[in-house]
């Protein structure tokens, strides 16, 4: 009986042990399947009640959804696959896991190691490079005429001629239009339309193309330049404004088109618009066209002076709400003055004699002083924009030889120069502290000092 009881007790112990063992196995298997118990490498940190950690998760190919991190904290949904190396925290207020990308200071060591390991394999010594070049040359020299012929034939087979490609496009009903063909369609659209809106739209499209020298000269072949010049006579301000805009873009740094436009009477029409009572937006585009015609074109500058162009520009300073035109006018006059000065310094260019004679007939500086431009220009130093001040300072410095007496009479000018000097001394000092040598503000300060010294 005692033996039987002992057997029963032993059997119960075995059953209990077996049950405990099976329970532990089931628990381990369950925790291994759950992402919440996945092995992680955690660095704990405290941050105002939030528990933060840097986590590197093992990738799980069975995950249905991937977490895409940003620089901001985002909630990590249950079951999402989280990339390695993110900043993780448990938000104690919401009870949810959040993650974001590491800051640069936290993750900068790891990228450095990667860059170091990735670049070492790409380094070659000078000796290795020389040997590679020598072998390359030797290999090229060893090609026989037959091998070279085969090589060229292989190249031809790989790449198709442009004619074949165009034929293929034509077979597919795909027409690759040239700029000339596109411009032809635009001009036809402008010419055939009676709607101002459609005409302005065509001019807008045309202006995009005429910036290129060849396309601008295509206007001559199409007869479109004369069409644009005739549009300057329109009573529609939108048509005038956009026509002048296209003309200005076409004339810019394009001598051939400049000459054609001049001979077609564009200069006179532009001056008429600028002298009339027009909106500032119209005058701005017209002044752009005038500037494009006059630059590097001394014969047009002569005609401009004879037609009273300088006086027309001076009248802008009497108009209301025309401040946006002031600096454009001063910039144009300064450029015209500098063209003549630079020509005298560079007397070794071709056609120098012809240009010298043409520029010598332009008395722009004398006309500026005679027509009372000196105080008008110096007064523009009151403008707040640094770019405007720089352009005015350059003009004032250039005009000192002829405007010196009037500048000295203007007590406000000297006070203004001293104020500008103090302002730009501070700005230039900040540039130097930031390690910038010969910066923008230092240049403006230098101009201010030069003018002040020359007026003493």
UniProtKB/Swiss-Prot annotation:
Similarity-based family: Belongs to the SIL1 family.
Stretches for region Disordered: 102-124
Entry-listed glycosylation sites: 191, 233, 347, 386
Record localization: Endoplasmic reticulum lumen
Keyword Endoplasmic reticulum: yes
N-terminal signal peptide: 1-31
GO CC, any one term: endoplasmic reticulum lumen
Key word Signal present: yes
Function description: Required for protein translocation and folding in the endoplasmic reticulum (ER). Functions as a nucleotide exchange factor for the ER lumenal chaperone HSPA5.
UniProt cross-references to InterPro entries, sorted A to Z: ARM-like (IPR011989), ARM-type_fold (IPR016024), Hsp70_NEF-Inhibitors (IPR050693)
Main location: endoplasmic reticulum
Stated name of the protein: Nucleotide exchange factor SIL1
SUPFAM superfamilies hit by this protein: ARM repeat (SSF48371)
UniProt GO BP: protein transport
């Amino acid at each position: 009986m005692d033996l039987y009881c002992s057997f029963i007790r032993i059997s119960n112990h075995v059953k209990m042990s077996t049950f405990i063992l099976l329970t532990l196995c089931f628990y381990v298997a369950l925790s291994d399947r759950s992402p919440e118990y996945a092995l992680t490498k955690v660095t704990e940190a405290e941050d105002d009640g939030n528990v933060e950690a840097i986590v590197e998760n093992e990738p799980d190919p069975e995950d249905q959804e991937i977490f895409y991190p940003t620089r901001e904290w985002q909630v990590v949904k249950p079951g999402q696959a989280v990339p390695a190396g993110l900043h993780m925290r448990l938000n104690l207020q919401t009870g949810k896991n959040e993650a974001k990308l590491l800051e640069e200071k936290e993750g900068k060591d790891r990228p450095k190691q990667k860059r170091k390991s990735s670049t070492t394999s790409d380094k070659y010594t000078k000796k290795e490079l020389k040997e590679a070049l020598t072998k390359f040359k030797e290999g090229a020299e060893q090609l026989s005429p037959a091998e070279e012929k085969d090589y060229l034939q292989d190249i031809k087979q790989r790449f198709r001629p442009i004619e074949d490609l165009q034929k293929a496009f034509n077979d597919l009903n795909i027409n690759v239009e040239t700029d000339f063909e596109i411009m032809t369609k635009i001009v036809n659209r402008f010419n055939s339309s009676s709607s101002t809106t459609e005409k302005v739209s065509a001019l807008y499209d045309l202006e995009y193309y005429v910036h290129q020298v060849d396309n601008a000269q295509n206007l001559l072949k199409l007869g479109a330049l004369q069409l644009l010049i005739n549009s300057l006579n329109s009573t529609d301000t939108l048509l005038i404004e956009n026509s002048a805009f296209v003309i200005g873009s076409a004339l810019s740094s394009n001598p051939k088109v400049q000459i054609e436009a001049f001979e077609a009477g564009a200069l006179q029409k532009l001056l008429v618009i600028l002298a009339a009572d027009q909106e500032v937006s119209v005058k701005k585009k017209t002044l752009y066209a005038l500037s494009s015609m006059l630059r590097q074109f001394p014969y047009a500058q002569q005609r401009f002076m004879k037609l009273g162009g300088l006086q027309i520009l001076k009248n802008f300073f009497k108009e209301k709400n025309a401040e946006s035109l002031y600096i454009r006018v001063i910039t144009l006059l300064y450029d015209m003055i500098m063209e003549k000065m630079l020509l005298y310094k560079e007397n070794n260019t071709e056609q120098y004699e012809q240009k010298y004679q043409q520029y010598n007939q332009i008395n722009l500086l004398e006309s500026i002083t005679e027509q009372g431009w000196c105080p008008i220009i110096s007064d523009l130093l009151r403008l707040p924009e640094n770019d405007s001040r720089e352009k005015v300072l350059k003009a004032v410095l250039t005009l000192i030889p002829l405007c010196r007496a009037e500048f000295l009479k203007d007590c406000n000018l000297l006070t203004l120069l001293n104020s500008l000097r103090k302002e730009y001394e501070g700005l230039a000092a900040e540039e130097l502290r930031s390690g910038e040598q010969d910066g923008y503000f230092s240049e403006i300060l230098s101009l201010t000092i030069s003018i002040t010294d020359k007026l003493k």
